[in-house]
UniProtKB/Swiss-Prot annotation:
The lineage of its organism: Bacteria, Pseudomonadati, Pseudomonadota, Gammaproteobacteria, Enterobacterales. InterPro entries: MFS, MFS_dom, MFS_trans_sf, MFS_Transporters, Multidrug-R_MdtH. GO terms for cellular component: plasma membrane. It comes from Blochmanniella pennsylvanica (strain BPEN). Belongs to the major facilitator superfamily. DHA1 family. MdtH (TC 2.A.1.2.21) subfamily. Keywords: Cell inner membrane, Cell membrane, Membrane, Transmembrane, Transmembrane helix, Transport. This is Multidrug resistance protein MdtH.
Length: 407
């Protein structure tokens, strides 16, 4: 028992260190793509949004297949190869002077992500007990916020000199992560079943509750995608200065440090997972609606802060609900399939909002994308409410607690 507990502790420490490299490497590059290509080079927001959406669709849309391979081959080869492929994608992005090259670099980044993301997430479910998932996800969110601010501050500083430096820095960080995983990651098997790839996929598709929940979250991810596209563009529009973009992520880091753990502990005690997810989503919708009308930077940052608070409330509950519905016999297949909503949400969120931004700019109607985003959020909220009304996900968590008591 001690050996198992020690393995879990060491595994969680590894996940936290690995997550640091991946998150910093991501945030050094991706939040600045829209600023560099749209604001500095003058490319259309739809074009850049399409490239970002393509990256999201490929990475998350192919997740079910990469997850099935990870169930069969184990986590290590998938994670290591994925990290190195993303390194190559960032190197190509550094010389992207045409839309074709930008799309190619995003596709390679996506391919890398689709290889390493499902098995990394499955390792969390394997190494963390169900009743500890909510708090561990909160720890990861806290780390994500701190690493995001490090990445974006570093990226914006490098962007003053050269976008190539931004991309090379991201590439180096992912290369280090790849070497670290090749060196230290044990050859974990993340599925307890020896079923074929197709059997793993069929197992997921037969779980109707999980499938409906996943696709309903598409709208949630459409809203979340704006952190990488529309929110940075709006801050640059209102402030007129590139340096103010980093304040988005500074605010996120401060709010995460102050609120993630207290909100998680308090809400776990008094509210169901379903309630926490819906309250967080409502907060996000309320914050997004007036953004196109705001002309003052301080007011804009307050609304963005409210958006982050909504995410802080919703995200641990969303992650835990998804994890509770997975089958330990096909963990990566489940995680991979769950990325489909992120794929659809990212594709529509990036390209759709970029297209609406271009139309709104032409028609002098800057509120257009924010109105549509709010409507999408309300539809998503209604879909979640209908699911939660007829089925209590909280019962799954209670079953896990009962197992804990028996142990």
């Amino acid at each position: 028992m001690y050996t198992i507990s020690k393995a879990r502790r060491l595994g969680k420490c590894f996940l936290i260190i690995d997550n640091m490299f991946v998150v910093i490497g991501f945030y050094v590059v991706f939040p600045l793509i829209s600023i560099y290509f749209v604001e500095q080079l003058g490319w259309g927001a739809f074009l850049v949004g399409f490239a970002l959406g393509l990256r999201q669709f490929i990475q998350q849309g192919l997740g079910i297949f990469s997850g099935a391979f990870a169930d069969k081959l184990g986590a290590k080869p998938m994670i290591v190869s994925g990290l190195f492929i993303r390194t190559l994608g960032f190197i190509i992005m550094s010389v992207a002077n045409t839309p074709l090259l930008l799309c190619l670099s995003c596709m390679l980044s996506a391919l890398g992500g689709t290889l390493f993301d499902p098995p990394r997430t499955a390792l969390v479910i394997k190494l963390v007990r169900p009743w500890e998932l909510g708090r561990f996800y909160s720890v990861l969110m806290l780390e994500d916020s701190m690493c995001a601010i490090i990445g974006i501050v570093l990226g914006t500083w490098l962007l003053q000199y050269n976008f190539k430096l931004v991309c090379f820095t991201g590439a180096i960080l992912f290369f280090i992560a790849g070497v670290f995983n090749a060196w230290r990651l044990p050859a974990y098997k993340i599925s307890s079943s020896h079923a074929s790839l197709l059997e793993g996929i069929k197992k997921v598709l037969n779980n109707q509750r999980f499938v409906i929940y996943v696709f309903t979250l598409t709208g949630y991810y459409i809203l979340s995608a704006q952190v990488m596209l529309m929110l940075p563009i709006r801050i640059h529009e209102v402030s007129g200065q590139l340096s103010y973009i980093k304040w988005m992520y500074i605010i996120e880091a401060i709010l995460s440090l102050l609120l993630i753990m207290p909100i998680t502990w308090w809400s776990e005690k008094y509210f169901k997972l379903e309630t926490r997810l819906m309250v967080g989503l409502i907060t996000m919708i309320i914050s997004l609606f007036p953004i196109g009308l705001v002309k003052n930077l301080h007011t804009l940052l307050i609304l963005i802060s409210l958006f982050y608070i909504g995410s802080i409330i919703a995200e641990p509950a969303r992650e835990t609900l998804g994890a509770l519905l997975t089958d330990y016999k096909a963990r990566s297949s489940y995680i991979g399939f769950s990325k489909l909503s992120l794929a659809l949400g990212g594709t529509v969120g990036y390209s759709g909002s970029g297209w609406l931004y271009d139309i709104g700019k032409e028609q002098n109607f800057t509120q257009l994308p924010w109105i549509i985003l709010s409507i999408i959020g309300l539809i998503t909220l209604l879909g979640l409410y209908c699911q939660f009304k007829y089925y209590s996900f909280q019962s799954l968590l209670n079953n896990s607690h009962n197992k804990k008591r028996k142990l």
